[in-house]
């Protein structure tokens, strides 16, 4: 890899030029309002990620000048050189968080600092420039305030926030980019799955496909992790399943579910009531909902909570011995999603999630959405407007 261009942490411009700006600041925001505002959709008709608000946030960066002033402007197409590194070598990353209109009509963000932390880590892994996480979050809040009427007046819908960071240097060399663009777009959304917000999903598990591997970027939110998963997702659908259960290694370790983290609520091998999820070992995305569920379960203190490896043999044995209570995915888009079946080695494994309530998954969903929609006060939220 050619790392001669821009790999120094102390890049400077041409001799005699001023020092590059190390970060953008929210106080420098330049806001240009849209002159024509679009009609707001009925929240009950929303299809995930297909409708966008009136405005967007953009911030440009170059090695020579550093960060330019952040701008909020009418939503518009990007103008990129066809040689931009994001288009050829996937020098990019994204984030996903939501704004919720509470029962008190206040607009809240849910644990956005965790998203900013993860975005920063992804940027470092992608060799994209550093930024001030607090300043970016403040810029995002200003964008949400401007488009606050797009936050659905509904407790079954929300405003999805998509920060994105891409390399824009017009060069076909495989190297760290000397130009980049950070932008944020907003989209009002309903349930992520067409089956509904809390209907169980079926999974397809086949070890011939791998989502991530040790030493890779599976713990970063990069588009390449998702684009490369689509072929397996299509095969899952062909096998009448809704999502892929990603396996890893010779022991077929259970890792993630589609775009979600995975939880298993069961009686473990030692006869203990346990909520288990795979550990953050570099192939698991450190999800905000994952962390929130672990935090809640630890606080409740009612059963063992573990970050541990789980294999398909562990699961099939537990199902045969009637030790599995619930299995569910978690993520910003879906919050909590029950699992009903797994197609593995041409056999369907029935997971009794719905037969068991699902008491725990329902309790977690209720607790998290109570916080998100302001039915319960919590320091996990930031009030925007």
Curated annotation (Swiss-Prot):
GO terms for cellular component: cytoplasm; mitochondrion. Expressed in muscles. The modification N6-(pyridoxal phosphate)lysine is found at residue 221. It catalyses: L-leucine + 2-oxoglutarate = 4-methyl-2-oxopentanoate + L-glutamate; L-isoleucine + 2-oxoglutarate = (S)-3-methyl-2-oxopentanoate + L-glutamate; L-valine + 2-oxoglutarate = 3-methyl-2-oxobutanoate + L-glutamate. Its EC number is 2.6.1.42. Homodimer. This is Branched-chain-amino-acid aminotransferase, cytosolic. It comes from Ovis aries (Sheep).
């Amino acid at each position: 890899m050619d790392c001669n261009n821009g790999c120094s942490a102390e890049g400077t411009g041409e001799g005699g030029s001023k020092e590059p700006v190390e970060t953008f600041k929210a106080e420098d925001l330049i806001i240009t309002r849209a002159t024509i505002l679009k009609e707001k959709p009925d929240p009950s008709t929303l299809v995930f990620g297909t409708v966008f608000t009136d405005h967007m946030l953009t911030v440009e960066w170059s090695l020579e000048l550093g960060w330019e002033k952040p701008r909020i402007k009418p939503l518009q197409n990007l103008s990129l050189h066809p040689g931009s590194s994001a288009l050829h070598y996937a020098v990019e990353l994204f984030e996903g968080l939501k704004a919720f209109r509470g029962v008190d009509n206040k607009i809240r963000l849910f644990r956005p600092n965790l998203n900013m932390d993860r975005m920063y880590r992804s940027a470092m892994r992608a060799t994209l420039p550093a930024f001030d996480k607090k300043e970016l979050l403040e810029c995002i809040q200003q964008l949400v305030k401007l488009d606050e009427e797009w936050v659905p007046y509904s407790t079954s819908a929300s405003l999805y926030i998509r920060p994105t960071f891409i390399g824009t240097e017009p060069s076909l060399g495989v190297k760290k980019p000397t130009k980049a663009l950070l932008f944020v777009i907003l989209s009002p959304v309903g349930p992520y799955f067409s089956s509904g917000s809390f209907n169980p999903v079926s999974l397809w598990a086949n070890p011939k496909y791998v989502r991530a591997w040790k030493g890779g970027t599976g713990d970063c939110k990069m588009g390449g992790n998702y684009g490369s998963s689509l072929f397996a997702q299509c095969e899952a659908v062909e096998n009448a399943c809704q999502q892929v259960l990603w396996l890893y290694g010779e022991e077929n370790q259970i890792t993630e579910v589609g775009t979600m983290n995975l939880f298993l609520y069961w009686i473990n091998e030692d006869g203990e009531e346990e909520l288990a999820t795979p550990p953050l070992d570099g192939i698991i995305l450190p999800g905000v909902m994952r962390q929130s569920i672990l935090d809640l379960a630890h606080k409740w203190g009612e059963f063992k909570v573990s970050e541990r490896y789980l294999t398909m043999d562990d699961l099939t044995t537990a199902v045969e011995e009637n030790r599995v209570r619930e299995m569910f995915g978690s993520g910003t888009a879906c919050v909590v999603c029950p699992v009903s079946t797994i197609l593995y080695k041409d056999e369907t494994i029935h997971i009794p999630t719905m037969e068991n309530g699902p008491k725990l998954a329902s309790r977690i969903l209720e607790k998290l959405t109570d916080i998100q929609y302001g039915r319960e006060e919590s320091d996990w939220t930031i009030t925007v407007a």
